[in-house]
């Protein structure tokens, strides 16, 4: 149930208002219906097609077909790229409104990918959109936004509490006009997917800089 905090002294009530906006309500209802009527039935097809498969890093015949059916249906309904706040490339939702959408996506293991809102692609697309060069956006962001490829994200390192990005020790050093990366990563999200075409790697370029840089 939506939560509305009581007024406290002179505090602004808006900062406690966690209700979905009225503008997002139609989209939320559409997503909810899609998950129940399209995503879940296709997920059942996906599971059935994968019975007997032993390799976790491959897809059995029929699995990707079920997934692509869902993606095609989502595209046709305009249920695509909700996570990007920029309305030109995404839906222009606030984080609060997207939280409600994400809660519905979580009711089916494939719903997020069917609507192109699955990690690690979501964060990788945000990085490319905000700091990517025009060439990088054309080569990598565009096919990611279109759901044609998948991506990976490499931050975790052996022996280091890597959930805090300040701790990463992998180095990137400029050698002429090329960056040379030295280090070790593991538990790389998305790397095992055969559709993965790009990996974003967290590295240090200036080890003597302040920790937050």
Where does each model-flagged region fall?
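A short core secondary-structure module
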Residues: 178, 182-213
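Short loop segments at secondary-structure junctions
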Residues: 105, 131-133, 175-177, 204-208
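A structural signal for short hydrophobic beta-strand segments in well-ordered beta-sheet cores
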Residues: 170-173
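Amphipathic, small/basic residue-rich leader segments at the start of a protein or domain
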Residues: 2-119, 130, 135-139, 143, ...
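A short, Trp-centered hydrophobic/proline-enriched beta-strand micro-motif
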Residues: 147-156
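Short, solvent-exposed loop/turn elements at beta->coil junctions and helix N-caps
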Residues: 87, 156-160, 187-189
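Flexible, glycine-rich active-site loops centered on histidine and acidic residues
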Residues: 125-131, 153-154
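Active-site-adjacent elements of ketosynthase-type condensing enzymes
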Residues: 160-168
